[in-house]
Amino acid sequence: MGRITRLTLALATLAVFASPALINAQAMSSDVPFKVGTFGIDGEPTVGLVLRDALIIDVAAANTALEVDPMYPHIDAPEDMLELIGQYEYGLKYRLYEIVNNVVRNDLSGAAYVHRVDDVDILAPIQYPSKIMNAAVNFYTHACEGCSAEDLAARTQQRQEDRGVPYLFLKPTRGAVIGSGEDIVMPYGRDRIEWEVEMAIVIGRAGKYVSAPRAYDHVFGYMVGMDVSDRGGRPPGGYGSGSDWFVGKGHDSFAPQGPWIVPKEFFGDPMEQLHQTLVIDGVTVQEARAGDMIHNIPELIEYASSLITLFPGDVLQSGTSGGTGAGRVERATGSGYLQAGETIRATIEGIGTLVHTVVAEEGIPEDLTGAQLPPTASYRGPAPR
């Protein structure tokens, strides 16, 4: 029997057989909102609860300390974020509420299992999702980069009258997913790399053919995501039909996520709350709210789940707004592409901020035979400035 199955049975057994006193003692709400994440503590990936974006509670250690009191029955702490997400709605969230309430009510911020955020490494929260699904061109302003106000209004009205269905694509997970503070690496010779800030919806409950009205029942929470993109395309020759989405979206470090996850009960309706921005070296290049979305989050979930079963820990990103690098090129305000040494800050209000430095890969092994992806300039010339 797998660990997750055993934990599910333990939680279910607790609910059925626990004494009335224990049931009454169980926390049904958290005194304060919290976030969840994965952190490097003493060199080990550790599941933690985030309070006020300042304190990190080591869940396993805090759970052990809590269970010293016989009022709290034994529950296995989740070993990783995928396990936490999968068990959250099966009773685990109430133990997390108890941990938070114990820290807050007893002023345990100085306990050994509570750490300052500056003293830990912030890792990608989910290591790793089984799939990342991204919505392409899902904001009206992104669908009309470089448009005049009149053109944008006309194009928006036209699209609203015929929205069709969403366009989704997959990004790699391990290798592509990085946490806040890790470098975004521009692959060797690829000089047309751009940014996109997106809301990342974390699935909490498995489902196939999930209708839009039931979509939020399958959501665990929300984090900040980025869809870093290579706009250099593939070289000529060979099979060249259509866009090469793997080249465009599939490089290492091209899926930043985090810095942590806000469980849905602490965020509210994302279609009302969403406010996302992206800043490069102090200059705001993207800013959008949910009203700019072409297909809303429940519709994206319904569409995605009509194609493939969604599982706990899967990530669905809702797309980006205008203000990308490609849009800056069209407006002739400079290349708009990322440059080594720049610092990116991608923020969603109420969730947090991803911070990344851009670095360039300096070289490649000398024994490559020529089958590798070549530098963009070798077939498209230098990137425009």
Predicted stretch roles:
Residues D42-G43, F139-Y140, A206-K208, S321-G325, ...:
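Short, charged beta-turn/beta-strand-edge "cap" motif at the junction between a beta-strand
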Residues T8-P20:
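Bacterial N-terminal signal peptides
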